[in-house]
Regions:
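A cross-family phosphate/adenosyl-ligand binding-site feature
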Residues: 1-114, 120-179
């Protein structure tokens, strides 16, 4: 499967390296796109090494004027995964804001999109964030629920990056539907 992994600004961004590594090792083609905030938590070089592809971090990375990246990645790939999906990213997509490569790719896509929210429990349980998630689900976006556990901030609650097998199970379920 051709999978775009969008990494957004969350402390859990480093956990997506395991996801990219697993997908690549099982034979999937993986393209990583990172928000600017994601690059503050983990280097794009880590994802480039694991995916064996240049990581996209900007709308304006392209060397070829005829290549429109957000359209290419939104149409020519099988699945888009947003892992971790921050509250900021969920809010932007739920409200049609396409102001970076990640949100532009998601909003331009006609392919399945899987969000993997990961954030502080107070953020995750906030009514605004929950309304954005509800809206996205109603629009047909797929989700892997965050786990409950000790978060990076020292609070225990819902918002933890899910276990890899839970994410892979959902990817395979979506992939099976779209064959």
């Amino acid at each position: 499967m051709k999978i775009v992994v969008c990494v957004t600004g969350s402390i859990a961004a480093y956990k997506s390296a395991s996801l990219v590594s697993f997908l690549k090792n099982r034979g999937d083609e993986v393209q990583v796109i990172m928000t600017e905030n994601a690059t503050k938590f983990i280097s794009s070089l880590a994802f480039q090494t694991l995916s064996k592809r240049k990581v996209i971090t900007s709308m304006f990375d392209e060397q070829d004027a005829n290549f429109v990246g957000h359209i290419h990645y939104s149409q020519d790939w099988d699945l888009i995964i947003v892992a971790p999906a921050s509250a900021n990213n969920l809010g932007k997509v739920a409200n049609g804001i396409a102001d970076d490569m990640v949100t532009s790719t998601i909003i331009a896509s006609t392919k399945p999109i899987l969000f993997v929210p990961s954030m502080n429990t107070y953020m995750y349980e906030n009514a605004i964030v929950q309304n954005n998630i509800k809206k996205l689900k109603e629009l047909g976006y797929e989700f892997v629920e965050p786990d409950i556990g000790m978060l990076a901030c020292g609070v225990e609650g819902k918002g933890k990056y899910p276990k890899l097998d839970k994410i892979i199970e959902k990817i395979d379920e979506i992939g099976g539907k779209n064959k």
